[in-house]
């Protein structure tokens, strides 16, 4: 196992990798939104590649969030297990946490973790064990924070003046 050191340059490299992953992540975001919309009987707006890339910029603009997102991304990009052993769940744990970190605070973090599992069953990325969990986590986290869900648009019915 190689050592991993997160430096500002390493975080920037992960930012670029995540940003350029839009051809894979954006269709998965939209497939996930379609599936969730069907389950809940609601229309959910689709996400464009430009909106995704802009939001990646917002996530990585927060240094505290950026260093943690970069660490999860780097770990999942290299994480593998011999024979893709069924009892190996570390990739699932890291994927859920990445989705939550991208999404932000509660309730979005928990919603992103739940959405991770929906996206994960629809994702089959070639490569190491963590590859599909990485794509699913990015899709779940960004779909949660991006506009398109009616309940997140406008004032909450539970706001107190």
Which residues are covered by each model-predicted region?
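Acidic, polar-rich N-terminal leader regions of halophilic archaeal proteins
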Residues: 1-161
């Amino acid at each position: 196992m190689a050592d991993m050191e997160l430096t500002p340059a390493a975080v920037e490299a992960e930012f670029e990798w995540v940003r350029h992953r839009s051809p894979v992540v954006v269709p998965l975001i939209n497939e996930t939104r379609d599936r969730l919309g069907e389950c809940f009987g609601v229309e959910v707006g689709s996400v464009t590649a430009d909106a995704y890339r802009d939001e990646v910029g917002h996530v990585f603009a927060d240094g505290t969030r950026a260093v943690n997102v970069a660490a999860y991304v780097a770990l999942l990009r290299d994480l593998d297990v011999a024979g893709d052993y069924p009892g190996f769940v570390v990739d699932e744990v890291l994927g859920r946490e990445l989705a939550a970190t991208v999404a932000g605070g509660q309730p979005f973090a928990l919603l992103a973790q739940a959405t991770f599992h929906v996206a994960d069953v629809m994702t089959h990325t070639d490569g190491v064990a963590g590859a599909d969990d990485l794509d699913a986590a990015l899709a779940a986290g960004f779909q949660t924070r991006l506009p398109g869900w009616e309940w997140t648009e406008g004032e909450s019915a539970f706001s107190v003046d």
